């Protein structure tokens, strides 16, 4: 803050802008997750600062934003055909969120949509494995009877072994799930189909989610 002042850089707080400019447009936490609400408020506040819209236009923005669907964020799909292997994912949830709030929101989403017990495919960047994620990852892993740890082709990606060690030290394996390790996202998808009727959750990294969507040929323009 002090540095911004010295450099004459404008510093604007989203909470102040949104509460003032969108006082009549509030989102219910029972419908939208905390990370989504924060993104929503930041986007609308930035637009208002830039364009200084009137009340009618702000209401139009607000209405339009509520219809936005982000592929790969709490993205629940049904009957996803893996055409290469002629196999079908009855229920597939993909989410690239990798911070504390996003992982907690993912656990809440799994619970509210009755997706537990599930098979969890988890891959994360090594620089994300810090103490603030221990409890969120523990809550997430509790939903899974089978946890498949994998990695992507990126220097930032944690190895399956490093991820397993972090989860063990976080108490995430206390419920004794089955654990499988692989460096191949494609192999992880194959492993996840060992119980065809069990919901599959792929999470922890946008790289991982991108690979899953690419391998399965998922169209990012729509969800089913």
Label every model-predicted segment.
Residues 103-104, 131-132, 159-160, 211-214, ...:
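Short glycine-/acidic-enriched loop or helix-start segments at secondary-structure transitions
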Residues 188-217:
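A glycine-rich beta-strand to alpha-helix segment
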């Amino acid at each position: 803050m002090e540095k911004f002042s010295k450099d004459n850089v404008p510093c604007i707080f989203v909470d102040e802008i949104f509460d003032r400019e969108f006082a009549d447009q509030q989102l219910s936490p029972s419908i939208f997750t905390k990370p989504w609400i924060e993104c929503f408020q930041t986007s609308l506040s930035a637009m208002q600062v830039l364009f200084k819209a009137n009340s009618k236009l702000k209401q139009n923005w607000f209405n339009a934003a509520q219809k936005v669907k982000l592929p790969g964020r709490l993205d629940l799909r049904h009957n996803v055909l893996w055409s290469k292997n002629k196999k079908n994912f009855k229920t597939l949830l993909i989410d690239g969120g990798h911070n504390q709030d996003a992982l907690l929101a993912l656990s809440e989403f799994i619970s509210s949509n009755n997706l537990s017990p599930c098979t969890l495919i988890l891959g994360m960047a090594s620089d994300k494995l810090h103490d603030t994620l221990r409890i969120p990852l523990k809550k997430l892993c509790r939903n899974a009877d089978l946890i498949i740890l994998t990695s992507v082709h990126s220097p930032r990606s944690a190895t399956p072994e490093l991820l397993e060690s972090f989860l063990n030290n976080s108490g995430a394996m206390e419920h004794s799930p089955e654990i499988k390790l692989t460096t191949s996202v494609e192999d992880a998808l194959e492993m996840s189909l060992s119980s065809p009727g069990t919901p599959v959750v792929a999470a922890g990294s946008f790289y991982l989610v991108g690979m899953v969507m690419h391998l399965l040929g998922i169209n990012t323009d729509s969800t089913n």
